[in-house]
Amino acid sequence: MHGFTRIATAAVLMLASASALAGRIEEIKARGYVRIGVSLGGEPVGFRNSANEPVGYDVDVAKQLAARLGVPVRFSDVSSDARISMLRSKQLDLVVANVSITPQRARVVDFSMPYNVAGLRVIAQKSAHVKTLADLNGKRVVVGRGTTADAFLRQSAPGATPVYTDNFAPDGVLLLQQKRADAGIEDASLLDYLASRNAQFETLPTMYGNTPIGIAMAKGDPALLQFVNAFVADYVKSGAYAANYRKWWGAKALPPALQAK
């Protein structure tokens, strides 16, 4: 009898859990909008236009995801420090903010399959004649303080002089535009965009690293994760990914290869 009671109790708990999980998407629909965190600190991934509206690659992805959900989106501009905690505290439903999928982050939030990839690239003044990593030695190179770019520079060109900034965009960009630095190392997507709009710069063709970027959400919601993964798979296979990438990085840009599972 006790065994039957335990089984019945477990079944009730499983049904209740399944109902709660299925209700997460329904909660968004009942609310009438989806809350999505984006990072508006760097073109072309996310920034504000002249009308102070959120625009950019990630913003377009978020809008398409909201359309798939059938509700409008309400954006929050999130910092790298706050985005995970805002998901876990349920202040946000999703984060589409150029978030790298790492084992450490995957322990506390769930990630969709990749909808973009990131890697480091080198940008330089054309007058600096930087063609290889070795050419950075003896040059002033702007990097974010304590970032992977900082560590990469110290390893790849120990003779370079780091010029530190806490925010590559806009502070590091300004240093380059004012020629207070010869070169810079940052996320390839940002630097490709910067070089396409500033004739004084050129980028090295190699992208160093290949880090997947995913849509993040609070753990414990397999229904929402499945929904978002289906969206990303269609986003890649339908050609929307390539079109969106070229919209923001230029018609001649080559979107990094993604696998739609």
Question: Which residues fall in each region the model found?
Answer:
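A ligand-binding cleft/hinge motif common to bilobed small-molecule-binding domains
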Residues: 82-85, 99-107, 152-155, 177-209
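Extended ligand-binding regions for polar small-molecule ligands
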Residues: 59-68, 134, 139-140, 147-148, ...
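Extracytoplasmic small-molecule ligand-binding "clamshell" domains
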Residues: 22-98
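Bilobed "Venus flytrap"/periplasmic-binding protein-like clamshell domains
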Residues: 35-44, 54-67, 100, 121-171, ...
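Acidic, polar ligand-binding/catalytic clefts
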Residues: 63, 67, 72-135, 202-207
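Periplasmic-binding protein-like
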Residues: 116-124, 170-171, 188, 192-233, ...
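Ligand-binding clefts/hinges and TM-proximal coupling segments of bilobed small-molecule sensing domains
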Residues: 148-167, 199-204, 233-261
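Short helix-initiation/N-cap motifs at beta->coil->alpha
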Residues: 75-85, 163-178, 211
